[in-house]
């Protein structure tokens, strides 16, 4: 079985080695056909504490790492402008 992947935005980095990633899922309503947007928040493992709030990241499914963590950061797709200023 293939591992699931999601792309989302980091919304919290206040925990050690953990970030909260918000993934937006868009789909048409079954009756009204209006595009509905649902946001799901995943806790993901960030071993190096490299992610900052606003970063676009790809997360992959992994074994359970704690009570709520079942995802890990695969790669940082783009950094937020705030994160780039802090690293310089």
From Swiss-Prot:
SUPFAM superfamilies: Nucleic acid-binding proteins. InterPro entries: NA-bd_OB-fold (IPR012340), Ribosomal_uS17 (IPR000266), Ribosomal_uS17_bact/chlr (IPR019984), Ribosomal_uS17_CS (IPR019979). GO terms for biological process: translation. Transmembrane segments: none annotated. One of its GO terms (molecular function) is structural constituent of ribosome. It comes from the Bacteria. CDD domains: Ribosomal_uS17. Keywords: Ribonucleoprotein, Ribosomal protein, RNA-binding, rRNA-binding. PROSITE patterns: RIBOSOMAL_S17. The keyword rRNA processing does not apply. The keyword rRNA-binding applies. GO terms for cellular component: cytosolic small ribosomal subunit. PANTHER family: 40S RIBOSOMAL PROTEIN S11 FAMILY MEMBER, SMALL RIBOSOMAL SUBUNIT PROTEIN US17M. Belongs to the universal ribosomal protein uS17 family. Part of the 30S ribosomal subunit. HAMAP family: Ribosomal_uS17_B. One of the primary rRNA binding proteins, it binds specifically to the 5'-end of 16S ribosomal RNA. This is Small ribosomal subunit protein uS17. It comes from Synechococcus sp. (strain CC9311). The lineage of its organism: Bacteria, Bacillati, Cyanobacteriota, Cyanophyceae, Synechococcales. The gene is rpsQ.
